[in-house]
């Protein structure tokens, strides 16, 4: 997805393993078992080890996944339904690896950071419309149906870091009922929403 300032790159691949556990050793063990079974017929492209940061915050300090659908209705947004019988119960997974310029981010005041995200940093309250810029992440990165109703996805983002390479980032993982929903979100972020606003978080 190529935009006027940034491009959301596409890395081809055939299989994605998303491994989560309370103990890192369990994640390693599962990944190792998978590798033992598939190493003769596959070529690994990338492996990212995320971690839980405090109370579910991204590495830039804001609570992540706030706008996920409630658990009792999550399947409605995240799982393919009767409209596609061949893939019913599956999900369209999007992954994006974002590297943050932490020096640039830390140079912003908390108030400036909040305007980038669209929420308060410490209590996770959404900014009021009279304060929140139209370029805020939680404004631009939304998808809507033909009637203008917001369509949600299930986010499972994780922060990651590699200090030796000065890499600090967010590994975006989104599960959606329809391919078009997450794509629309990314198009808004990188190419602009209906009003042409780009996601300032990408800066």
What are these regions, as identified by a protein language model?
Residues 1-203:
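Long, histidine/aromatic-enriched segments associated with O2/redox biology
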């Amino acid at each position: 997805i190529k935009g006027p300032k940034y491009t959301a790159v596409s890395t081809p691949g055939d299989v994605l393993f998303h491994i989560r556990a309370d103990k890192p050793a369990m994640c390693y063990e599962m990944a190792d078992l998978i590798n033992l079974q598939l190493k003769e017929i596959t070529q690994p492209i990338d492996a990212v080890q995320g971690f839980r940061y405090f109370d579910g915050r991204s590495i830039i300090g804001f609570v992540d996944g706030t706008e996920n659908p409630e658990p009792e209705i999550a399947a409605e947004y995240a799982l393919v339904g009767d409209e596609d019988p061949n893939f019913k119960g599956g999900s369209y997974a999007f992954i994006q690896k974002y590297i943050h310029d932490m020096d640039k981010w830390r140079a912003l005041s908390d108030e400036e950071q909040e305007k980038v995200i669209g929420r308060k940093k410490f209590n996770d309250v959404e900014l009021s419309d009279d304060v929140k810029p139209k370029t805020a992440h939680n404004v631009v990165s939304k998808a809507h149906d033909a009637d203008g109703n917001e369509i949600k996805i299930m986010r499972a983002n994780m922060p990651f870091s590699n200090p030796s390479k000065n890499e600090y980032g967010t590994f975006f993982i989104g599960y959606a009922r329809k391919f078009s929903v997450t794509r629309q979100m990314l198009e808004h972020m990188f190419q602009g929403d209906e009003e042409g606003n780009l996601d300032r978080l990408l800066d």
